[in-house]
From Swiss-Prot:
Region (Disordered): 1-87, 109-128, 293-507, 847-874
Family, as annotated: Belongs to the ARS2 family.
Single biological process term from Gene Ontology: primary miRNA processing
The name this protein goes by in its record: Serrate RNA effector molecule homolog
Amino acid sequence: MGDSDDEYDRKRRDKFRGERSAGESYARGADRADRSRGRDEWAERGRPRQDYRDYRPPPRDRGYSPTREGPPMKRMRGDGWGDDARPRFGGHEPYGMYGGYNHDHFGMHPAGPYGHPGGLHPREQQSAGDMQTQPCMMTLKQFLATQDDSISDSEAIQKYNDYKLEFKRQQLNEFFVAHKDEEWFKMKYHPEESLKRKEEQFGFLKRRCDVFVELLDHGDISKVSVDTSNTDPLLRLLDTVVIKLEGGTDEDLKVLDEKPVEIVKILPEKPKVEVKKEPTLEDTIKKEKISIKEEKVEEADKPKEEKDDDKEKPAAEGEEPEGEKNDAEKEVTAEREDMDAEPAAKEPEPEEEPSRKKDRRKRSRSDSGSSSSSSSSSSSSDSEDEKEKEKEDKEEEEEKKETEEEAAPKSPKPVEEGEKEPQEEVENNGHKSGDEEEATKKDQAEPEKMDTDEAVVENNKESEEAEKEKDTSKDEEEANKESNEDKQESEKTETIDLVKDTTVGNSPRALHRTSSIFLRNLAPSITKAEVEAMCKRYNGFLRVAIADPLLERRWFRRGWVTFRRDVNIKEICWNLNNIRLRDCELGAIVNKDLSRRVRPVNGLTCHKTIVRSDIKLCAKIAHNLDDKVGLWKEQEDNGEKNGESFGLQSKNPVLQNITDYLIEEASAEEDELLGLSTEAAKKSNDGELVERDTQLIEVLDKLILYLRVVHSIDFYNHCEYPYEDEMPNRCGIIHARGPPPQNKVTSNEIQEYIRTFEGKMGSFLARAVDLEEEEMKKLGAKDAEAEVEKFIQANTQELAKDKWLCPLSGKKFKGPDFVRKHIFNKHNEKVDEVRKEVEYFNNYLKDTKRPQLPEHPGNTKKAPSDAAPPTAGYRPPYGMAHAYAPMYAPYAQPMMAPAGRARPGFGRGGREPMGEIRRPIIAYSDLDMPNFSDSFL
């Protein structure tokens, strides 16, 4: 029993050992191990009662349990719970709800890496952490804590307003200093760079306007309607504009009439051409069989012709063909072995034979079946062969007549070649060719008998060798031609997906088709000239477009590099991916072609009422944009300007006589007298079908195309396509009217559509208004002369009495006046830079839409009446800001928090705050007393 007790104690001591060994990593102290050791070693204590384990069934294997084998969950802490992260709960956070930005009060950028926020909870939105914001401004309570206690309320409010204004000035100045050296910022506000950019954009605009006027004079604009049913003419017009903008001529416009090459049908032809080059074994066997059958037919015809023509010939001469047959059979078998060893079959020349001859030979081959070379020697003895010979004799006679008629005006040589061509598949057939020559001589005239057969054989061999040499030369020429054709086809299939811009001669150029690469990452410090220098090394480079930076992307920019259509764009993209520009990965990818260039909008836009409203809106936008850039200003300088008169003062041909279509006409008096006004009101309530006015639509289409071509504004999409002249696809996308609805439309729906559309296009009607001088002074506008004076004082240093130093040159002078003169004379360019810097900063302040960091969420607290929490004007419990609480349950505002007592005047218009439950009034009164409950009502 002792052994069993020891074993039981060991098991009891090891009860939690497996779990603790896995959890030793979470700070298991030495004192805990010491406490457990004494209990394990106390084996002498008695156990009067059974242990609880005796009543349990035997344990089973639990397997892997991460909750048991790992440390407890209460010990796990997130990465963002360190000292640098914000507390999740509690009302003592200085920067409001969102934390982890590490902003200093006197710095624009966070203390950590550029653009990277502090610790964020994983469940918070990532966009909230990536956004750069201004540092949090002190609240009034925090500001008063820094002031003297004896300050009055009016002074405190005045000082706090001054603090807020100074804080805003500081943020604007810091943003300017941080971005003034970046190219995108210079193009907007620098006095020299911005002027160059404006001149460049005006040149693009002027060029577009000239192209539009040219197409308008030719009548191309009036032929096109902006409807999805008119997609092809609309795309042709846009492509015509692009070709004209690229400097194309009328000859280049013929490219638009060419049908696109079907790519799918051409690509599979490449393997078919390769199969034709190599003859298979079956083809060689078929050619051998055909040649053997032809030999058999001609040999069988020979004795018949000799019997019919020359019956008086001796028997010795009639036996010659049989001997020749045996020799030919031997030669055929020898040649077969050679052909098996070297399968180089020569193709026959079927072009010289007539089509009838081919058909008849095919029929004769099918009738004769598959006869072998072994049966050719005994063919004359078989009855079936005799029947076949009779049929073939008749066919041969007809063929000879036809060939004689064809070769009559020519020489008899082509006839011989035509007969010998099928025999050229087998080499060294001299005896048979000699027999054929004798037969032809017998048909034309009486032949002279030859003394010996050897002379005939030698002559025939010489003629055959000459013919073979000619045939081999012909075959080589044909093979060379086929190989050249295959090379050309392979070259075509290599660039089959590209439309080549052929500039040879006067051939039209596809200038509207380009290839492009999209650069996803361009650091703010990278300039356009650097990207152009990098891409100019590749052939076919055209232009570069770089977008404005985005705050959400840490002021990184995107770029598009345009090349000609015939370049290998994937190879260029691969090379650009291996380049780092200013230690920045460009992220180059191939930019796809536009999928849908004409996109539909609501078909309700073709209704007469909406069209008239759109004409008014289009005319206002066109006039406003023309006036903003001064497009038609040269022609308007003589007359007085009137901002509301579109066609009266403007020389724009699209806006002329536009007032005729802006005024509605109606027979109101007649309708009133006849009582038709009430009926019209009923019809408007019931709805009306979509009415299309062709004349109004033509006027509207000219305005829409003018905005799209000249100002890059897609009217029906209510948006502008910026820097389109530098993008890969100029005039790429346009939105057009879709099919009209079939159901009736009420007047309320029409008015709602017009009101919504005008609201979306309101940004194009707003005129650019600069800040007033007083407002600019409040924001810290600088004076040029004052800044120059500061610059001179900073560069005038007193070393000793009557000893002054100019740090710019290191020279010493006797007085400060001499240093001033020296700076103006020798360092005048530095003074000019100071003046330009002042103008640079003031231009930034003037812009009402200037870029800047967004305010911190803690700075934009709403009034209690606007964002009334359930606490009726008091601060939300647990320090949670009501307007910025994350939209997930564990960290949202507590719903069971106690509600505070409402104050008079708080809430929305004196009403009870949302979610507050009023406590019922409890009255204590004596039951013997009369009821005075009215006093509590």
